[in-house]
């Protein structure tokens, strides 16, 4: 795996709190992303950047087989992670075109989104018209996980070369998967659920403008060049945390509050450890983080009089 957090984010305070008597629950629950790429200009060890993908890229496993329904880009992180690991490999592939990458690829991290961090509406709106975003283009040119070629045979050859060892990808298999997908674009009542999903996404104006490319055939040279991206597993966070009561006071292994010790937000498993369900993440947890912080503040205020 590659690292989605800096070296100093090591969770050591959870262990220190446990040594002080605090109880940790759900320590087996982790959240790892499956769209990780190595940063060509790393800021920490094994620095990973996550691709925030639109719905159009074709997702293949290490042997070139398409991931099953509904494991499409941006759909189900935990389900996709489980499937990828069941293949016996720890990486997968996106196959896409220049038309897709210029509209559908966003990258995590403030340094990868200068338009947002710079608070420039002009630059944000430019995502709809300005071609491949600068940070994405830099990865296309310098990122070790990106391959750009004008035709499929050359693309597959370089994909195998990137991984090294015995070639795992067969040109015929990859071509079969792409052709099967492309054929469904001829049918307005597509039997391909991913095609149906991206057509549905484009029904929303915002996605049509800056997030979802117009459906097109990947093997049509007019839509090229072809692009392959090796996707690595990247670490992010534990979904477990310190067990607390309703005042956000840390509980000991005996179930009693540890006096003067509080835990909120991520340290408490996002407000209690699983209170939003197993597959919920990110913005879904904001309410629990804020609420647990408020509870801790009020309880601490009462404790000190």
Predicted regions and their residues:
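Short, ordered coil/turn segments that flank beta-strands lining enzyme active or ligand-binding pockets
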Residues: 62-63, 246, 253, 291
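Short, solvent-exposed cationic patches
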Residues: 82-104, 268-280, 284-292
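An anion/pyrophosphate-binding glycine-rich loop and adjacent beta-alpha core
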Residues: 14, 23-169, 173
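Glycine-rich loop(s) and the adjacent beta-strand/alpha-helix scaffold that form part
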Residues: 1-40, 282, 286-295, 299
């Amino acid at each position: 795996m590659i690292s989605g957090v800096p070296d100093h984010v090591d969770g050591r305070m959870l262990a220190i709190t446990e040594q002080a008597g605090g109880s940790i629950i759900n320590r087996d629950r982790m959240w790892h992303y499956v769209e990780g790429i190595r940063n060509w200009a790393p800021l920490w060890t094994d620095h990973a950047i996550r691709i925030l993908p639109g719905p159009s890229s074709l997702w293949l496993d290490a042997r070139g087989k398409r991931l099953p329904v509904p494991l499409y880009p941006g759909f189900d992180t935990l389900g996709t992670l489980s499937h990828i690991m069941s293949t016996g490999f720890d990486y997968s592939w996106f196959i896409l075109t220049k038309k897709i990458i210029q509209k559908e690829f966003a990258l995590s991290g403030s340094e990868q989104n200068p338009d947002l961090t710079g608070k420039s509406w002009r630059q944000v709106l430019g995502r709809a018209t300005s071609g491949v975003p600068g940070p994405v283009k830099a990865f296309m040119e310098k990122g070790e996980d990106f391959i750009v070629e004008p035709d499929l045979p050359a693309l597959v050859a370089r994909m195998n070369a990137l991984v090294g060892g015995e070639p795992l990808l067969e040109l015929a298999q990859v071509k079969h998967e792409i052709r099967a997908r492309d054929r469904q674009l001829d049918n307005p009542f597509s039997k391909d659920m991913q095609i149906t999903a991206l057509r549905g996404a484009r029904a929303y104006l915002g996605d049509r403008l800056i997030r979802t490319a117009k459906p097109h055939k990947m093997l049509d040279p007019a839509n090229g060049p072809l692009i392959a991206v090796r996707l690595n597993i990247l670490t992010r966070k534990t979904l477990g945390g310190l067990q607390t009561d309703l005042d956000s006071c840390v509980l000991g292994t005996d179930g009693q509050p540890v006096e003067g010790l509080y835990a909120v937000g991520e340290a408490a498993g996002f407000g209690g450890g699983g209170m939003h369900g197993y597959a919920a993440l990110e913005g879904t947890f904001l309410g629990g983080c804020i609420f647990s912080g408020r509870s801790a503040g009020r309880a601490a205020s009462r404790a000190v009089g």
